[in-house]
Amino acid sequence: MGYSGKPHHQLDGEIRESTDGKKWVIAGIPSRSPLKQINLSPGVTVTETEEQDQCPTTPTAVSVRIPRVPPCPAAPKKRKPSLKCSYVTVTRDYFSPPDLETVFIQRASY
């Protein structure tokens, strides 16, 4: 709202005068006129071939098709465990010093 120096025919809105003689313009939001309905004359018809030409379609030629994917290979098989231990029986010799028993006897006496 405010005072405008434009001529009255260029103003959009409502013009009011205040008590001190100034003219004020209250700006309004211009509304659009409703749209007019479009009527086709009854002599104009659209044939099916023209209608099909206007709508996009998916290409169906063999050259544009996505190639078929071959089947996936089989999953890898689990490897056999390596033979870490041998099945050959080995005799183990134990070392037994003659004074080994005396060491344990002395500790037991404390």
Curated annotation (Swiss-Prot):
UniProt organism field: Arabidopsis thaliana
Name this polypeptide is given: Cyclin-dependent protein kinase inhibitor SMR8
UniProt KW Ion transport keyword: no
Oligomer and partners: Interacts with CDKA-1 and D-type cyclins.
Reported tissue expression: Expressed in the root vascular tissue.
Annotated InterPro entries: SMR (IPR040389)
Function: Probable cyclin-dependent protein kinase (CDK) inhibitor that functions as a repressor of mitosis in the endoreduplication cell cycle.
The entry's keywords: Cell cycle, Protein kinase inhibitor
Protein origin, superkingdom: Eukaryota
